Amino acid sequence: MVWGFGNVVNNFANQGLTVVFSWIFMIALYFVPYALMVGELGSAFKDSQGGVSAWIRSTTTPMLAFMAGWTYWVVHVPYLAQKPQALLIALSWAISPSGQLAGVLKELNPLILQSMVLVVFLVFLYVSTKGVKVLKVIGNIAGMSMFVMSLLYIVLGLAAPAITGHVATPDITVKSFVPKFDFAYLTTLSMLVFAVGGCEKISPYVNNTKNPSKNFPKGMLVLAGMVAVCALLGSIAMGMMFNANAIPEDLMMNGQYYAFQLLGDHYGLGSLFVIVYALANTAAQLSALVFSIDAPLKVLLGDADAKFIPKALSKTNKNGVLVNGYIMTAILVSTLIVVPALGIGNTNELFNWLLKLNSVVMPMRYLWVFLAYMGLKKLSNKFKTEYKFIKNDKLGFLVGLWCFGFTAFACIMGMFPTDVAAFSPEWIFRVSLNVLTPLVLMGIGLILPVISKITNSNEELSKKN
């Protein structure tokens, strides 16, 4: 799914009502060209099953193609470190819709919470080796339920003030929607990029469209319109229900549940909305956790090139489980679960930091889409495509470069926290983690081909002897 209610809540928590302007900017100047580039790439490489790494292989070099594939896997490491947190929070609201249990979680010592998170992760790491197919069905149903609940919130949230006569944010004017373009604002851009990314998953469908040169861009523009409506109206609904001038400090952690709790209160339905949403989110988080462990690993290692990935990592047991791949996942994710708890003050700040880290790391994979598009424009005579986003190759290259540069800029700015004093010990600790995490994760990818070369040479020598 390209969109979720959490995107509205998290960005409202970052920017308040000024996020309305940001959404308009992002969708018009980033999401729409991004989606249409994906359409052209999907059309140009319609026979390719390898996704972004195949696009990169066709337009650049095999090594860069490997790094693209590695990036698509490794960005899931912070995601997997954060998912058990989200699962525990969703479960706490499902069990205690008053928020009492969620309050207990929020006050826990970060080391205690992260120990629980580590146990949950390791349990589901084991579960994912069993290939629980029913979870995918449950996850799809839960995801659809959450989407419907999100639309319901927008409609009922906008209507609530007409019933109660009360708007939480006082004196809303045009100025309420215009951000202050300072350093703090620039650090929030990565969360917006994180929210609208991922539409490259739609690329295979461009060739299933009748008259793709006309109908696919129309479909993408409809998708962009739907995202825009959800983002804009959802943000305004949040401003109706929450005071944008006094945003709760734990809105990222608990905001989705506060929103449905308030909605139930406004309509006299008690905890009904929050229970339904929490149950759906629990199932969705559980399913996402299991499948985000297994599926990306199979994509990376299932058809691995021995030039770039050591054969040992592709080793499977009798049940077809990528044993060493799972061990690598366990080590990387467990490290990212435990280490931050040693230097971040409280659980709410830890949750917010990990979510923001995802907004820095996850968009790194979008860079490869834009690089592939620039490569396609450089080699346009080599590839035939039924659909072209921009017919002028030089202009198309510049648009790809704009999206690439903006994504990189947003990721870099997202590394700097604004909720702690600059250059304080905790600020330095967080910035260090934000910088080192992507560097280490990408660095491992650069080291693997070297290890592969050495191990392959050793294998050949042992065979000769």
Q: Predicted segment positions?
A:
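Membrane-water interface regions at transmembrane-helix termini and the short interhelical loops
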Residues: 10, 43, 67, 119-142, ...
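Helix-loop-helix junctions that connect adjacent transmembrane segments
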Residues: 20-21, 104-112, 140-275, 422-424
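Hydrophobic transmembrane alpha-helices that form the core helical bundles
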Residues: 33-40, 44, 48-117, 126, ...
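TM-loop-TM module centered on a large, flexible mid-protein loop between adjacent transmembrane helices
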Residues: 54-55, 61, 225-290, 309-358
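Membrane-helix boundary/coupling elements in multi-pass transport proteins
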Residues: 71-87, 201-205, 268-311, 366, ...
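Transmembrane alpha-helical segments of multi-pass small-molecule transport proteins
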Residues: 95-131, 147-155, 192, 196, ...
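Membrane-interface loop-to-helix entry segments
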Residues: 114-163, 197, 220-225, 355, ...
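C-terminal membrane-solvent junction of multi-pass transporters and transport-like membrane proteins
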Residues: 316-317, 366-416, 429-430
